[in-house]
């Protein structure tokens, strides 16, 4: 899927349609010091298997693409619902 770098859409902060810059949101590296990660490391260490059962459902065919739309007037960002696509590209329009 190809998406233009700039799109006209409604800004809830300006309360009107304005030009927005499109950015793709990427997942950052998970912190090793969070409580859940420390607990997970403690449970999986030593003898014994994985603490949770293996997921038996099917694999989804595609990943959801997370976008950030930044308003060119007020510079506030909105996050539209994720789009499913195998390929995603931001192009000059």
Swiss-Prot record:
Any GO CC annotation of this UniProt entry: ribonucleoprotein complex
Sequence positions that bind Zn(2+): 11, 14, 71, 74
SUPFAM superfamilies per record: Zn-binding ribosomal proteins
This protein's record includes keyword NADP: no
Pfam families attached to this UniProt entry: Ribosomal_L44
Functional summary from the UniProt entry: Binds to the 23S rRNA.
Name of the molecule in the record: Large ribosomal subunit protein eL42
């Amino acid at each position: 899927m190809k998406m233009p770098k700039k799109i006209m859409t409604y800004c809830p902060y300006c309360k009107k349609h304005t030009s927005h810059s499109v950015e793709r949101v990427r997942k950052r590296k998970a912190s090793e010091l969070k409580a859940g990660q420390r607990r997970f490391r403690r449970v999986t260490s030593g003898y014994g298997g994985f603490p949770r059962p293996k997921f038996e459902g099917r694999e989804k065919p595609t990943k959801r693409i997370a976008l950030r739309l930044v308003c060119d007037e007020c510079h506030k960002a909105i996050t539209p619902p994720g789009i499913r696509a195998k390929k995603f590209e931001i192009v000059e329009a």
